[in-house]
Structures are given as C-alpha cells and as structure tokens.
Amino acid sequence: MSRPRLEAHSNSSKPALSSRPNTPTIGLALGGGGARGLAHIAMLEAFDELGLRPKVIAGTSIGAIVGAAYASGIPAKVLRAHTRELLTQRFGLMREVFAERPLQRLRGLFSGSSSLFDAEAVLELIMPKGVAADFDALDIPLKIVASDFYDQEAQVFTSGAVRTAVAASMALPAIFKPVVVNNKALIDGGLTNPLPYDLLSGDADIIVAIDVSGAPVPDPRRNYPSAVEALFASAFLFERTIVREKLKSHQPDILVPAGTSHFQILDLMKVDDILAAAEPTKERLKAQLERILSVETLPQINDALPALTPSATAPAKSKRPGLLGRRKHKEPDNS
C-alpha cells in the first residue's frame, strides 16, 4: 500500500519532491524562542523551494505565530515580506511595542504600576491578512501549545479560534496578560513544551523539529547578564532543560538548531540579521530533505540516529554531519 503524498506549493520554482511515488509525509514542529524564532520563516522557505508541504504542524510561542500563518496557506516569502515591513519601519507601531515598552513595563512590575499587553490585541495588529479564524479553516492541520498556569501542564489546541490559541501560546509572563480560555489562565507554551515534536508522533512518517532556543551568549563587556537578560534567559534555561530531557527518551527524525542563539529574545528589530543568520541552516535543511525524500520508499531509511552535537570540523562528506544528519540511507535488501 502506497503512502500518502505530500502536497506541493504552487509557488515552488522546481519540480516538487512530493511528485514522486510513495513520498513519506512530514510533520513539522516549530519551537519557541522569542525573536530567534523569526528563523522559522527561513526554514519554511526551504519547504516551499522544494515544493513540499508538511502534513501537520505543531507550534509553541513564536512557532505558533509563524505556524498559524503558514498553515493558513500563506507562503513563507510572503511571511518574510510582511515581517520585514512590520519590524523595519523606522516609526512603525511594532518598533514602539516591542523595542521600548516591554522594558518600561518590566520596570513597572517592581513598582506595582505595570499593565501588561493583551496578547490577542497585539496579534490583531501583527498577523498578516489571510490567517484562518478557526482551526477548521486551516490548509494544514495545526497543534498549538500553551501552558495552564494553575494546573501546571500543557494545553494543546487543535480546534476553536486560532487567534486565541496563538495568543495563549505566546503569552510570556511579565510581558503579556494570561489568556483565559474555559476558565483556565493560559501562558506561554514554552514553559511546558518548548519544542512540541512529540505531539506529532503517529501523525507523519518523518518528524522535523526546528529548535530556536539556544543558550545565552556572554557579553564581552561584562561577566554577568543584565537584569532583563537574566529574567528572560532564566525562562529559556528552563525550556532548554525540558528539551534536553525529552531528547533522552524521544527524538525527532531531524532536529534543526536554527543558528540564531546569539540573538536576544527581544531582538525583533534585527529581523534581517536573524534571517541572514538562519540562511546556512536553511540550505542544510533543504539538502537533508532532498536526500531523505529521494529514496523510493520509507523502509529504505534507517531509524533515527542518536542526537549528535554539530561539529564545525566534521568532514564535508561525513555521513553523520551533526543534528541535520540524523538519518542515513540504507541499501534495499534484494535477497
């Protein structure tokens, strides 16, 4: 019995890999990471340029924002153009919202005078036109992760209002108000499942996880973080610990560190720099997807290899070139 085909995006400039028979399906997990998650756009461009379309997407925080737009049928290039226009205008609304006011509001927390942002209202301002209002209207099935503050567990959305689910997933404490859904106070999904590839088990043949978390990069001017950096980095330290523990027991087939860990989580104004930094990883992802999907049938691909540490010194033709080389070809058994 043949496997279902991947659908091809019409904006691809080359023959779609999904036009081949028995092409395995792909589940795509987009992790949380603040501004670093703008790199998701570049990774989605890799899919579009190959003519591939994920069978299902799971997203957390900024991964939920980007994932909701893409699952609505908005091509990655359109997302790139929209995001650049939104964040690079000199006097644009988002420069005020994301570059200045969060820090002022953080200071207000300590004086009791802070009023936090409404995540749904912010989404209404920043989301591109064409994002589906309801999960049922999405082109690609989507799972969005938020965190239940009081029950201290993940809340996964697969139905209902898309904007409400995304708002809950991105409601980072100290910046956004919790989003109340069915009498539950929901906050940033990264606090319970920052890289939700495990939600895709059984939904697709190959699971690809895009990790945009990364570790803090030391400032050469001082040997300790600023107060704001420490506040946010502490949350991401916790999230990276969750991911590491998950990887010990359950791994995606392709784990992609996006290469943007040296950016701060509020560096949204550096959108061009972040996208440029993600470009080499995008090309490696394209090469890996082409290699995997060029085999005739899925059984010719070995089970996922153990997680590997990327190495700048690894030979160019190495069969194990790091986290992007977790699968290798297996010659068919003709006996």
Residues of each region from the PLM?
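Patatin-like phospholipase
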Residues: M1-T60, A68-S335
